[in-house]
């Protein structure tokens, strides 16, 4: 008997052009990162399957049974998707847990977040206005928005159901057809979500889900002439390659890429509150988050005291069984990824860093069978060190002291990334100055990793382009059109 509900992913079939069937790629064996036990074998797509899905999506988009619906009619389907997600909340949370090893407490939140995302964009459809622009003569002018067409949505393995929802909900709301490419190692919850979408009333062919190798399927999707937009969340180098191909096609892209986010603790901060926030900002999700606060800047006057409290807190974090509600850190996604994290820690030590805690695999309670790694904190490195400049995507924090705002900002902004940042201070004027000067798309003040679906999310610099969430998020999946209505029968000027 399988240790979780597989009713939403029966037989490991995948959705290609409205049909649940076996893909023509090599089967993928999904395992549980906490103990390497078998989840199930999933069919995968190959290049031909990807091309078939795109052609079917284009045909489905051109039909009137989705793009031709009135906005409130599409909204009803999105509301129904949200309802079905919540009806299957616990099954989906456990499926997500088995997929990537996140603790059940986190996956429950992610499932609820996915439902809220569909609900929010349904509400947007009910309330979005078009613009009646000021006239410059005897004519009426207005701006309207139309679907783009076929959207390729490529999502990561760290929070699949939330990432899928953040692309599917606005893309479907906009009247588009979507070919979803989930990460190779986490196909399960994406397939389950597709079944929910069909049950809710998304017409056949409007959504396909193609598990498999990104280098194969992703390449077909990005290059295919019928794909009119790519929305990608993942590594910066892959995103850069997508942008190059898109430039040749003159195709719009949304890219949510890497990060190396600074967290700043000022000398007037509530240190206990800041300790809790810094620990959560880097070690929740085992550090496998693009927004993880992986660079820590602490004002020198409180550096020693703060670091003492922080290290003590890190050592108390509960690392282990993802089924336990009190677990704070689960395993990393794979043995290969854990080895990458270990190489970065070794590099940090070679560069002169001092290990304050962690830096090893935990033992006991069966954790040897999984891909666990202890929360790790280093100090004694300059911001120019590789471990401070390159995204590790794991539970590794590097701490550095700072003396004044000028030196702080010079270091915090000295990064190719610009995704997020956190500030801990009681001084709202200081918070305002620093927040406005930071070169990032999101800044948290006296909190971290909190999100509102109604607030746009974006990266600066090499952390990406485009917007997710908020009303701007739905417009990312629509194209604007201007209409001019003549109001008199006077001849046009050249005919006079």
Predicted feature residues:
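Hydrophobic face of amphipathic alpha-helices that form TPR/SEL1-like repeat modules
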Residues: 1-35, 60
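Glycine-rich loop-to-alpha-helix module at the N-terminal edge of alpha/beta enzyme cores
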Residues: 37-128
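Rossmann-like NAD(P) dinucleotide-binding subdomain of oxidoreductase/dehydrogenase enzymes
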Residues: 86, 130-273, 402
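Short, well-ordered beta-strand elements within core beta-sheets of diverse protein domains
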Residues: 39-45, 62-66, 153, 263-266, ...
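Structural signal for hydrophobic packing residues in well-ordered secondary-structure cores
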Residues: 61, 65, 82-89, 93, ...
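Residue-level signal for inorganic ion chemistry
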Residues: 36-37, 74, 96, 118, ...
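Conserved C-terminal structural/oligomerization subdomain of aldehyde/semialdehyde dehydrogenase
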Residues: 37-40, 227, 264, 318, ...
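ALDH superfamily catalytic-core signature
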Residues: 237-382, 445, 492-496
């Amino acid at each position: 008997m399988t240790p979780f509900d597989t009713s939403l992913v029966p037989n490991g079939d995948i959705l290609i052009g409205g049909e649940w069937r076996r893909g023509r790629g090599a089967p993928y064996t999904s395992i549980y990162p906490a103990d390497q036990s078998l989840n199930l074998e999933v069919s995968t797509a190959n290049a031909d399957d990807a091309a078939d899905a795109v052609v079917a999506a284009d045909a489905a988009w051109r039909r009137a049974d989705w793009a031709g619906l009135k906005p409130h009619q599409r909204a009803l389907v999105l509301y129904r998707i949200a309802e079905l997600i919540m009806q299957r909340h616990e099954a989906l949370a456990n499926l997500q847990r088995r997929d990537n090893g996140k603790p059940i407490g986190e996956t429950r939140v992610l499932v609820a977040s996915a439902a809220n995302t569909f609900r929010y964009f349904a509400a947007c459809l009910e309330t979005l206005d078009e613009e009646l622009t000021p006239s410059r003569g005897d004519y009426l002018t207005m701006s309207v928005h139309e679907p783009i067409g076929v959207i390729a949505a490529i999502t990561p393995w760290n929070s699949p159901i939330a990432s899928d929802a953040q692309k599917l909900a606005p893309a479907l709301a906009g009247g588009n057809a979507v070919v979803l490419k989930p990460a190779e190692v986490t196909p399960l919850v994406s397939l389950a979500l597709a079944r929910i979408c069909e049950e809710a009333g998304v017409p056949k062919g409007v959504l396909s889900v193609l598990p498999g190798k990104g280098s194969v399927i992703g390449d077909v999707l990005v290059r295919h002439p019928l794909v009119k937009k790519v929305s990608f969340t993942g590594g910066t180098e892959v995103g850069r390659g997508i942008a190059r191909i898109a430039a040749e096609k003159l195709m719009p892209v949304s890219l949510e890429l890497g990060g190396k986010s600074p967290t700043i603790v000022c000398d007037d901060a509530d240190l206990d509150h800041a300790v809790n926030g810094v620990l959560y900002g880097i070690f929740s999700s085992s550090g496998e988050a693009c927004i993880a606060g992986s660079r820590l800047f602490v004002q020198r006057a409180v550096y020693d005291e703060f670091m003492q409290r922080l290290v003590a807190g890190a050592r108390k974090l509960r690392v282990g069984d993802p089924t336990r509600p009190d677990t704070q850190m689960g395993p990393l996604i794979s043995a290969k990824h854990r080895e990458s994290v270990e190489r970065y820690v070794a590099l940090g030590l070679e560069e002169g860093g001092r290990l304050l805690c962690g830096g090893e695999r935990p033992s006991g309670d069966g954790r040897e069978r999984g891909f666990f790694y202890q929360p790790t904190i280093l100090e004694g490195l300059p911001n120019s060190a590789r471990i401070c400049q390159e995204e590790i995507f794991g539970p590794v924090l590097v701490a550095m002291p700072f003396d004044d705002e000028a030196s702080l900002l010079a270091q915090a902004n000295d990064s190719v990334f610009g995704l997020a940042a956190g500030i801990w201070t009681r001084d709202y004027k200081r918070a305002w100055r620093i927040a406005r000067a930071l070169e990032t798309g999101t800044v948290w003040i006296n909190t971290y990793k909190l999100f509102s679906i109604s607030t746009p999310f974006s990266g600066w610099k090499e952390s990406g382009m485009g917007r997710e969430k908020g009303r701007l998020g739905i417009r990312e999946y629509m194209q604007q059109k201007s209409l001019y209505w003549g109001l008199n029968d006077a001849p046009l000027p050249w005919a006079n």
